[in-house]
């Protein structure tokens, strides 16, 4: 919620906020009816690779079932534009770098598997109904901050990713 407040302050625009479980299709339907969005940027999901190997069912339930719930609500409200936050983990452990978009897919963990499954689900939806506009983003861990430095990755505790860890050390927090 804090990040949303910073975005509102920076942009001067109030952003509607709903705290809900992405797997709750009825609540999502109500939100879509209320807000009438024309598109969705989908970042919701569990995202720790290591954790996904310990509790894979939680990842499948939240990431897969949650996204299917979201897609149902979108379709029922004629919202057929989605940008999906996938992951470079769908490439597994490539033999060379840099990784190119057309490299073979080789998932090595449940988190990456949920991302690949969802890419396939979204591709199937598009093939079945070309009114859908689907963008799949396969990026690595992004890092950066707004020029004001009011908005950027500021993890609680010890970060899971290298660059946020380095920045925390640099500013004396670790």
Language model: regions and residue ranges:
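N-terminal Rossmann-like NAD(P)+-binding domain of SDR-like oxidoreductases, especially those catalyzing
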Residues: 1-145
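NAD(P)-dependent short-chain dehydrogenase/reductase
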Residues: 123-174
């Amino acid at each position: 919620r804090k990040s949303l407040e910073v975005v509102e302050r920076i942009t001067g625009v109030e952003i509607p906020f709903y705290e809900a479980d992405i797997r709750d299709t009825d609540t999502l339907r109500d939100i879509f009816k209320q807000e009438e969005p024309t598109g969705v940027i989908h970042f919701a999901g569990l995202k720790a690779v290591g954790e996904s190997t310990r509790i894979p069912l939680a990842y499948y339930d939240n990431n897969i079932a949650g996204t299917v719930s979201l897609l149902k609500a979108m379709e029922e409200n004629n919202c057929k534009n989605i940008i999906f936050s996938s992951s470079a983990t769908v490439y597994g452990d490539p033999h060379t770098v840099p990784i190119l978009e057309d490299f073979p897919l080789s998932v090595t963990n449940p988190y990456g598997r949920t991302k690949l499954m969802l890419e396939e689900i979204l591709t199937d939806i598009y093939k079945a109904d070309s009114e859908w506009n689907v963008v799949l983003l396969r990026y690595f861990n992004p890092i950066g901050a707004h020029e004001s430095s009011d908005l950027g990755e500021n993890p609680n505790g010890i970060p899971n990713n290298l660059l946020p860890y380095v920045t925390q050390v640099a500013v004396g927090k670790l």
